[in-house]
Amino acid sequence: MIFNHSPIFLEPHIWGKHYWFVIETTILAMDTKEKPSREFVSFFLYSLQNILPCPTCREHYQKYFQKTDIDKLLTSKKEILLWIYNLKKEIQNRNGNKFQFSTFESYIKDLEEKYIPKKENVEISSISKEKNFKSL
C-alpha cells in the first residue's frame, strides 16, 4: 500500500513538529557570512513549497514564501527567525489556535532552551550561546 505511485498525504499533527525541528535547527546551523551556506538554506526553504506532506499546507506556505525575498533575510539569523516566527503565528491564527509565544523574544528564548546546549552539559566547544545568538 505505501509503495504505490500515488501520493500519501499526512495530517500536520503527524509531521509538523518534526519539520519545525529541522527548519529551526537548519537555520541555527547556517553560517550567515558564508554565501554557500545561505544558498543551501534558501534552496531548502524554497523546496518546502513542493514537499510538505499536506497539499493545503503547501499552498499556504507557497503564498507566504512568495511574499518575501528570502535571500535578503538569510544574512541575519534574527531576520529569518522572525520570518519563521511570523509563519508559525500565521498558521496558528488560521487554524483558530492560540499562538504559544506572546513575543518574538519568547520564541527566541524557547529556541535557546531547546537547542543550545548548556555549558555544564558540553565540553568546551565551538558551540556557545554567545557565538550563536549574540549575532542575532
Please provide the spans of the model-predicted regions.
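Terminal, compositionally biased segments used for targeting/anchoring and flexible tails
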Residues: 1-136
